[in-house]
Amino acid sequence: IFDQMFGGAQQTQQRGLDVRVEMHVSFTEGMNGLDKKFTINGHQINVNFKPGLKNGQKFRLAGKGQPHPYNSNLPHGDLVIHTHVEANVNFILQGDDIWIEHNLPWYDIIRGCKIEVWTPDGLLAIKVPAASYPGKTLRIKDKGYPVYGKNKRGALLCRINATYPELNEQSLEYIDKIKHNQENANG
């Protein structure tokens, strides 16, 4: 009775210990998914990871950890896999969206144009609409990072940055004419 009231009874371990593993993968492996082999207690475990692995994601494989140290009839612990997805210098991952930046001459931003940008899937043609502005973000649906375990992807977000070439006297005169025409049109 005393032990029951004050918790003096020791709890016994009901299963083996969990095994924790840190798994480092590249951005491309995380995006495309991969098969990975783990060796636990001399046994090889094959795990298939679907496309869309994220940094910090945890996976628990029940019964794939350590056996119970004293009783082989009790269940094994679990294998806990903690993922680390390396950053990519060309792409910024934000949720399931991938951000990229593209530099364009200011006149192409104003007039509009077609550009080709590098994505994790390769080159992609994008239309920059006329009357765009520096810092504008173009959103392309379903071209971002895969959503883990689903047949779905985030968006590709392309931020347009302006470049300003050195202008000669004639170019500056054209700009002055455009400015003058615009001021007259606005009254």
PLM regions with names:
Residues 1-39, 68-75, 80, 182-187:
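Post-J-domain flank of DnaJ/Hsp40 co-chaperones
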Residues 43-44, 48-187:
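Intrinsically disordered, low-complexity linker/assembly segments
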